[in-house]
Design a protein with these regions (language model features):
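Catalytic-core signal marking the mid-to-C-terminal active-site face
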Residues: 308, 312-449, 456-484
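Peripheral docking tails and interdomain loops at the edges
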Residues: 107-110, 123-136, 515-567
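Short beta-strand/loop segments at the ligand-binding rim of alpha/beta enzyme cores
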Residues: 31-35, 251-254, 521-529
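Active-site mouth loops of central-metabolism enzymes
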Residues: 33-46, 137-141, 263-269, 452-460, ...
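N-terminal small/glycine-rich loop or linker at the start of catalytic domains
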Residues: 17-42, 126-135, 166-176, 255-260, ...
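Helix-rich catalytic cores of soluble enzyme domains
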Residues: 92-282, 295-311
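Short, small-residue-biased leader/transition segments that mark boundaries at the very start
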Residues: 3-8
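Long, structured ligand/cofactor-binding scaffold of large enzymes
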Residues: 9-113
Length: 567
């Protein structure tokens, strides 16, 4: 890895420019990325109508995600009716993509479209989409898949604008990987494809130019800018090692899509804000195309409104903020250059580790890749349960008055099981949402009452903390400015019929206040003390057992109280 670092440091400041190897600053001398949106194809005719509409609304890169298992040449003609192929980039994903690719190639050959005017991508990805997600190739050891890929690469040799393979890097991110893992594993899968294609007789140039990378962008703003910059540099060096005649094949062709891992199903409009900062990261770093995930994707099929907002984020970044007018504005920023360097180093280390195991396929088969991602996901889950990591609207600052609508189903908040050596996408907020949905649908309306007393400033601070704490489970919080006496507070608490009463005061007040509340309250409600006062052992000795504070595992603690209330 020190070699990679030296390479990077040498290349970093030597008047590095966009469009010049190793492409840290971009593969082109401009930053005109394409605005990408996905249309789900159940019925080709309906999908065509949606496509024409969004193409008129500023989209210049369209993805057709094909759902039906059978798809004919006639279906393809219906789907592409009135779409001028040279005017737009088209991507095909979903079921039977290799079969669809055959149909597409036949169509463009029949229509004799000039090769340089065709810009088409296929999301064929047996290594990540099949092997890593499903646990196996479509056929024994994948021989069939790779023969098919080789056939498509041969057929599209003259079409520089057709990319056959898309490395689905978002699968790692959306299963909970770290930024470094997502990059290293994507590079390793890309390298595996290169090696396989060269083994099948293709040159490095022919192989590299058929590979497209797709990456998820999370809300970790600066790290994501650095990831995309580091990725270009590392991929350029990987391809360069095979001595291509020119540098052009060393350019990483990258599509970015905003993350689904951090999307929340409660308070979903916050997802619009996440998508915005993520789109900014991608457009500052420079990508070929960018898709902002519609804000409601977590719980329903995107609709006209959510798709329009998603497009408008990018249209605004271009037409109002002019992000497309500047290339790599982050270049030369000490902070971002250093981050790029450290991500490049860490990702290169991990890439080398995979190569030492025999490449991506071997590393996957040994369990290394999936175990790595699952360990990262488990660490993130713990961070979210304990609020080391924040997901707005889920584990912090929830919308107090929100009740789940009928569009929010149990399926939307249930984490998919990833059997054995496979990765399944999930969302970081699912555990909180499943708990809250259970409360929303329980037919009960549990309440938590804030008994604020003692010193006013501390009482308010503790009440604010406690309200946010209990509201995360959909428990109705009753906040109170301040009670002059504990008797007055307990009387109001009993009148509210709240199942939980939270004493909110300063640490010094608790030794006296908490036992008094307990005495007056009896067993008519669950008593909770907000904080971790020094007198905790004495209070526990008096039977006061419940404390919430910044060290609490919010998720487990809330589940405990729900159980106590019989919900």
């Amino acid at each position: 890895s020190s070699a990679a670092s030296d390479v990077y440091k040498r290349q970093k400041f030597l008047g590095s420019e966009a469009g010049v190897f190793p492409y840290v600053r971009g593969t082109r001398a401009h930053n005109r990325w394409k605005i990408h949106q996905t249309v789900i194809v159940n019925c080709p005719k309906e999908a065509n109508a949606v496509a024409l509409k969004i193409l008129n609304a500023g989209v210049d890169s369209i993805e057709f995600q094909i759902v039906p298992e059978t798809f004919s040449a006639e279906d393809l003609n219906t789907l592409l009716k009135d779409i001028h192929i040279p005017a737009v980039e088209i991507t095909f994903s979903g079921s039977k993509t290799a079969h669809v690719a055959e149909l597409v190639i036949a169509k463009i050959e029949k229509e004799q479209l000039p090769a340089e005017e065709v810009h088409i991508n296929f999301c064929i990805d047996p290594l990540v989409k099949k092997l890593t997600s499903k646990g196996s190739f479509c056929s024994e050891n994948g021989a069939k898949c790779f023969e098919k890929i080789a056939d498509l690469v041969r057929k599209t040799k003259t079409y520089k604008g057709i990319r056959v393979i898309t490395v689905s890097g978002e699968i790692f991110s959306n299963a909970g990987s770290t930024i470094v893992e997502a990059l290293a594993f994507s590079l390793a899968a890309g390298h595996d494809y290169l090696v396989r294609l060269m083994d099948m007789g293709f040159t490095i140039e022919e192989a590299a130019k058929k590979i497209r990378f797709s990456q998820a962008i999370t809300s970790n703003y600066f790290m994501e800018i650095a990831k995309l910059r580091a990725g270009r540099m590392l991929w350029a060096n990987i391809v360069k090692a095979y001595n291509p005649a020119k540098n052009c094949p060393c350019k990483m062709f990258t599509h970015a899509v905003t993350s689904t891992w951090n999307q929340t199903a409660y308070d979903p409009y916050v997802n619009m804000l996440r998508g915005t900062t993520e789109a900014m990261s991608a457009s500052i770093a420079g990508v070929h195309s960018l898709e902002v995930t519609p804000f409601n994707k977590a719980y329903e099929d995107p609709n006209e409104f959510s798709m329009r907002i998603a497009r408008n984020v990018e249209l605004l970044l271009k037409h109002e903020s002019h992000f497309d007018q500047v290339v790599d504005p982050a270049g030369g920023s000490y902070y971002i250059e250093n981050l790029t360097d450290s991500i490049a180093n860490e990702a290169w280390k991990l890439f080398r580790e995979i190569e030492e195991k025999g490449g991506y396929t071997a590393a996957y088969e040994s369990g290394f890749i999936v175990e790595r991602v699952k360990a990262s996901a488990a660490a993130k889950d713990k961070n979210i349960a304990t609020r080391r990591e924040i997901l707005l609207g889920a584990n912090q600052y929830p919308n107090f008055t929100e009740v789940a609508g009928k569009e929010l189903t149990e399926a939307a908040v249930t984490r998919p099981v990833s059997e054995g050596n496979t990765l399944a996408p999930y969302r970081g907020s699912m555990a909180f949402e499943a708990m809250r949905l259970h409360v929303d649908r329980s037919g009960k309306a549990p309440k938590a009452f804030m008994l604020t007393c003692g010193s006013l400033a501390m009482a308010r601070a503790r009440a604010q903390f406690s309200c946010n704490f209990f509201a995360c489970a959909g428990i109705k919080v009753i906040d109170n400015t301040f009670f002059k006496s504990i008797e007055e507070g307990v009387k109001a608490a009993l009148e509210s019929k709240a199942e939980i009463v939270v004493v909110c005061a300063s640490d010094d007040d608790y030794a006296e206040a908490a036992p008094k509340v307990k005495e007056l309250l009896g067993d008519k409600a669950i008593l909770v003390v907000a904080g971790a006062p020094a007198c905790m052992p004495e209070l526990e000795a008096q039977g006061i057992k419940n404390f919430i504070n910044v060290k609490s595992n919010v998720l487990e603690t809330l589940k405990f109280y729900l159980k106590e209330m019989g919900i």
